[in-house]
Amino acid sequence: MSPVRPARGPSDILLVEDIRFYGHHGVTPAQQEVGAWFSVNVELALDLTPAALSDDLDAGVDYGQVVRRVVEVGTGERVHLIERLAGLLCEALLREHPAREVTVTVRKVTAPLDGVAAVPGVRMTRSR
């Protein structure tokens, strides 16, 4: 019996959600000084068949590496806009993983905005 394959090419998505870190990003000097909590969701579009068939981490993507890279980028260079942060994350993840496409959602969980539970964010998709 042959292995089950996705129809018309792989359409697999690897998810790592709600990666949290404290970053110093924002437009104002006060935002950069005080910092805020950020939450990031990552979606990597790649063929997961090798990992599904082998049950071998070397055939897939190590979620821990994804988390570490997101935290490293998020706590590294200070940027003004979460759009820039999302772009940096997309670049790093595409460079380091065999995904054909990556989508990141970045939310500034403790943004200094008026209103109840205002959580600004962006979703960015980039591909090879």
Report the location of each language-model feature.
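N-terminal, polar/charged subdomain of small-to-medium soluble alpha/beta proteins
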Residues: M1-R128
